[in-house]
Amino acid sequence: MKIIRKVMLAFLMGLFFLYGKSIPAHGAQPVVVAIDPGHGGENLGAECNGYTEKNLTMIVALAMKEELEKYEGIEVYLTREGDKDMSLEERAEFAASKNADFLFCLHFNMSAEHDLFGSEVWVSAFGEEHQEGYSFASGEMELLEEMGLYPRGIKTRLNDRGEDYYGIIRHSTARGIPSALIE
């Protein structure tokens, strides 16, 4: 559970870096955050020692939502409630339906061989979504590193069509929502 606390703290601080100067005063429009617990349903994600990525992302997402809801001026939604399959486009569409200011997609670097470690944050390679995603990711990575997690960096990746590689980033960018995918 120590890692969950670290991720939550880093996420909160990342929001501060991104929206710190513009978190609304009482009565103003709230900052709307969508948290996407990666995988779900039949899509287990990575598996190691009886743990599945879909369950770990949900545990952390629920804890993050509970913590963030304690703060005035922040509205939080989860893209999926419970263990169900959702396409990446459906997740981005859900965030858009809530008028999300930011979409945070949660994953874990894990493998049976234990050859994946540390954390990395993926953001859009394009426009304002890149700038806002990178701003969030910078604060996030700085804090995760201070907490002792190995920094694998802030990254972008393109597919063979020259678009953002990760579907959740591509679909959220198409809807004008800055996003970050943390591994």
Q: Whereabouts are the PLM-identified features?
A:
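Bacterial N-terminal signal peptides
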Residues: 10-19
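Bacterial N-terminal signal peptides that target proteins for export
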Residues: 1-8
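Hydrophobic alpha-helical membrane context
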Residues: 17-18, 48, 119
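Extracytoplasmic Gram-positive cell-surface binding/anchoring modules and repeats
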Residues: 54
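Active-site-proximal helix/loop segments of hydrolytic enzymes
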Residues: 28-32, 58-183
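Short glycine-rich His-centered loop
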Residues: 31-50
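Sec-dependent signal peptide cleavage junction
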Residues: 19-29
